[in-house]
Amino acid sequence: MNIEISNVAKLPSRFGMFKVQAFKEDEKEHLVIIKEPYKEPVNIRIHSECLTGDAIGSLKCDCRDQLEESLKFIEKNGGMVIYLRQEGRNIGLFNKINAYNLQDKGLDTIEANHQLGFKTDERTYEIVDFILKYYKIKSINLLTNNPKKLMGLHNVKVAARVPIIIKPNKFNEKYLQTKKNEMGHLLDDNKKA
């Protein structure tokens, strides 16, 4: 793994003042959004890119809601959002749009990925281990509903899982049920939203 690291820059946002640093891994450029001060265990959100949700506000998923809730939490409590360039559970934007087309025809998110020849989830988290080691972080509170992220980290202690509570909408209810029932996502708290 060949990794280049950018300088740190200030980033004012509608969620508050952050610092940002980019990590270039081969052809992918990941972003770390930092709110200081932070202390161990460090509040960490690992967020995979979702152009349709994060930038356009798609209601088919809960990605933008999770990102925004995480930024609010980090702004208030300190920590980092590690924004990974792994669009569509790492199948890429082109294939994700083809998966959306299959979902429009009745397949769920997993069936669509399989129909296109992909695994349920193609993401990897080695770069996260590298980033946490770079910042000398040994213990984290992981903001996630995805148990795979808990298992995907190898060089850090996960002290706690912090659920991200999102209210479902009529467009993403099936998607969220599939994530819960088939991928093991921990979404029971969403019913309280």
UniProtKB/Swiss-Prot annotation:
GO terms for cellular component: cytosol. GO terms for molecular function: GTP binding; GTP cyclohydrolase II activity; zinc ion binding. The active site is at D121, R123. Keywords: GTP-binding, Hydrolase, Metal-binding, Nucleotide-binding, Riboflavin biosynthesis, Zinc. Its EC number is 3.5.4.25. This is GTP cyclohydrolase-2. NCBIfam families: PRK00393.1, ribA. The keyword Transmembrane helix does not apply. Binds 1 zinc ion per subunit. GTP binds at R45, I46, H47, S48, E49, Q66, E87, G88, R89, T109, T144, K149. It comes from the Bacteria. Catalyzes the conversion of GTP to 2,5-diamino-6-ribosylamino-4(3H)-pyrimidinone 5'-phosphate (DARP), formate and pyrophosphate. Pathway: Cofactor biosynthesis; riboflavin biosynthesis; 5-amino-6-(D-ribitylamino)uracil from GTP: step 1/4. GO terms for biological process: riboflavin biosynthetic process. Its cofactor is Zn(2+). The gene is ribA. Zn(2+) binds at C50, C61, C63. Belongs to the GTP cyclohydrolase II family. It catalyses: GTP + 4 H2O = 2,5-diamino-6-hydroxy-4-(5-phosphoribosylamino)-pyrimidine + formate + 2 phosphate + 3 H(+). It comes from Campylobacter hominis (strain ATCC BAA-381 / DSM 21671 / CCUG 45161 / LMG 19568 / NCTC 13146 / CH001A). PANTHER family: 3,4-DIHYDROXY-2-BUTANONE 4-PHOSPHATE SYNTHASE, GTP CYCLOHYDROLASE II-RELATED. The keyword Membrane does not apply.
